[in-house]
Amino acid sequence: MVRKPNSMYRNLAKKAYTRKEYMGGIPGVKVVHFDMGNLTSEFPMEVSLVVDESCQIRHSALEAARMSINRKLNKELGRMNYHLKLRTYPHHVLRENKQATGAGADRVSQGMRLAFGKAVGTAARCQQNQKIFTVFSNPASVEKIKDALRHGGHKLPSPTHLVIEMKQES
């Protein structure tokens, strides 16, 4: 089965379609982990990957970005020196009206009759300036974290930027 290009699903044109109790046959979410690295330690700094535009991010794109960022951080810093958090969940169900192609397709195809479509995947609906990934770590490793998040941001459909915040001492 051919996957449609992301440009078909990128924009927030329609309402969210999330009521899974009314639907059948929704593919599972590909995102495996939402928290990675050292989950117990408190770190003084956080670096976040933020989307510049409102968009829908497919679950496969979130998983690809997560794997890229986590692999780079694990290799550069070691598993105990960071905490990576994915801050969004793909609730929105994507639909596609399948079209028959090839010889004799016009006899089999329904065209636009009953064109509601079947569920083909899920996506996270993100607003402008929403944090997608956050890495908690020490200030000494900020350059390596920025590099890893920049690489992961290339796998997302919207332009991104980084926000660095230090936790307040109380």
Curated annotation (Swiss-Prot):
The record, for Gene3D superfamilies, names: Ribosomal protein L10e/L16
Question: What CDD domains is this protein classified in?
Answer: Ribosomal_L16_L10e
Q: Which Pfam families does its entry note?
A: Ribosomal_L16
- Is the Transcription keyword given for this protein? no
- InterPro entries per the UniProt record, alphabetical: Ribosomal_uL16, Ribosomal_uL16_arc, Ribosomal_uL16_dom, Ribosomal_uL16_euk_arch, Ribosomal_uL16_sf
Q: Which GO terms describe its cellular component?
A: ribonucleoprotein complex; ribosome
A GO molecular function held by the record = structural constituent of ribosome
Extract the HAMAP family matched here: Ribosomal_uL16_arch (MF_00448)
UniProt similarity note: Belongs to the universal ribosomal protein uL16 family.
Q: What is this protein called?
A: Large ribosomal subunit protein uL16
